[in-house]
Design a protein with these regions (language model features):
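N-terminal Rossmann-like dinucleotide-binding module
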Residues: 1-42
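Glycine- and charged-residue-rich phosphate/anionic-cofactor binding loop of Rossmann-like
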Residues: 28-30, 282-295
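Beta-strand-loop-alpha-helix segment that lines the small-molecule cofactor/substrate pocket
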Residues: 60, 66-67, 71-118
Length: 348
């Protein structure tokens, strides 16, 4: 299939590498890119998607541009008759989510969201364990994200650190939130309740750099995700599945899963673009359909509107540290508790 890429810099560079690989494997033809800057790619570059489509006629468009541009680009791709793989967050409001979903159905097209950890073997194995009852009744899903980030992190793009487009739950730890919602089986529900505690330790940003969210729904285990970019030491993001018969610990970035401290064998990962192409060719189910990002989009939209108070923190060179947060985010995931319930000085 003929594939075009919108946004070839930053994370988009990974898509360039993947498209070149798929071309060598004979699975896709990488026809061109759209980018506002000059980019070093082995295919023609265009200033906008219609111009590219007029000459190159893509069948699939991969979108890896700033989040605020996603809605318009997805709709443009649909108008051109293309299926879409769009990076997370796919969209920033439920209104946009519903509009894109309806347009896809109307045109007979598909939209895959860029939650690549849904394609990992560890995710599929964990879903199987939960479904089989191996962990017993699931009593809660916790996730913790703890990274060290310097000032340069917020200088990488104009939208970085901007509320409504960035934030720990919406961007760097979006996978933690999405994975927890999936494992709680609430990803498509419209009746979730969301409790947010968002904070920022830098006065140069408007989005949160430290956050906790609890998501609940009738008949589903509670979800708590706690995150920070103001840690003293980084920790690979982790999802904890608490059950009456045991606990699963999933390090999704490493495709690693343990159950009651035993390492589980997992199948190879599935590439999202390969999956989308096979969906079109053979009917293989999509790994990360947009429909499965409804609850995530609801939380993301609320993050864009919530208060984000400034916390006192320590500056150490080009880093900002929030004392105590390293332990707090882990405890929140372990206890399925919010910052406030843990008695943090900065909890509400």
């Amino acid at each position: 299939m003929r594939v075009a890429l919108v946004g070839a810099r930053g994370h988009g560079a990974r898509h360039v590498e993947n498209l070149v690989r798929l071309g060598h494997d004979g699975l896709a033809t990488f026809v061109g890119v759209v980018d506002v800057a000059d980019v070093d790619v082995p295919v023609p570059s265009y200033p906008d998607l219609p111009s590219l489509a007029d000459e190159l006629h893509p069948e699939v468009v991969v979108i890896s541009s700033p989040p605020a541009t996603h809605r318009d680009l997805v709709l443009t791709a649909f108008e051109l008759g293309c299926d879409v793989l769009v990076e997370k967050p796919a969209v920033l409001s439920l209104t946009d989510f519903d509009e894109i979903s309806a347009e896809a159905v109307k045109r007979g097209l598909v939209c895959q969201a860029g939650f690549q950890t849904q394609g990992t073997g560890s995710y599929r194995r964990l879903c199987s364990l939960i479904g089989s009852g191996a962990l017993g009744e699931i009593t809660g899903i916790g996730a913790a994200g703890r990274w060290v980030r310097t000032d340069s992190y917020y200088e990488r793009a104009e939208w970085a650190g901007r509320q409504g487009e960035d934030g720990t739950l919406v961007n760097p730890f979006a996978h933690a939130l999405q994975n927890a919602l999936l494992l709680a089986d609430v990803e498509e529900r419209t009746d979730i309740a969301v409790e947010l505690e968002l904070y920022r330790c830098r006065d140069t940003i408007t989005a949160d750099d430290t956050a906790c969210v609890r998501v609940t729904a009738d008949g589903a285990p509670p979800v708590v995700v706690a995150t920070t970019l103001c840690a003293t030491t980084s920790l690979p993001p982790v999802v904890l599945v608490h059950g009456t018969l045991g606990q699963a610990v999933w390090w999704y970035d490493d495709d690693r899963l343990t159950v009651n401290d035993h390492r589980m064998a997992v199948a190879p990962s599935v590439d999202l673009l390969e999956n989308l192409i096979r969906h079109r060719q053979t009917g293989e189910p999509l790994v990360a359909p947009l429909a499965a990002a409804r609850a995530f989009t609801s939380v993301a939209e609320q993050c864009g509107k919530a208060d984000v108070p400034l916390l006192p923190a320590r500056r150490v060179g080009d880093r900002v540290l929030l004392d105590g947060i390293d332990e707090v985010v882990v405890r929140a995931a372990e206890k399925i508790a919010t910052f406030t319930e843990l008695g943090c000085g900065f909890g509400r």
